[in-house]
Amino acid sequence: MVYLIHFQTKLHHAQHYIGFVASDLMQRIELHRANRGAKLLAALNNNGINWQVVRVWLNGDRTLECRLKNYKKSRCFCPLCTGKA
């Protein structure tokens, strides 16, 4: 599945993270919270910036993850940024 994380405050230019997990999303989120996932999320944690999972594509695969990342406008998929929350 593919997931979208929204940052409470921008870190440099970034305000979102798109990731993929094959099985257990909650376990992956716990790894991110423990600074053992993506380096970007570890930097957020170290700077005290809160973040949350705002969207999940349950049938998403790595191909979808790459397409979403290549789109370069992840805010378009974020319900908090588009006002659809």
Language-model regions, residue ranges each:
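GIY-YIG nuclease catalytic motif and its immediate N-terminal context
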Residues: 1-30, 34, 47-85
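Cytochrome P450 catalytic domain signature, combining two hallmark sequence patches
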Residues: 36-42
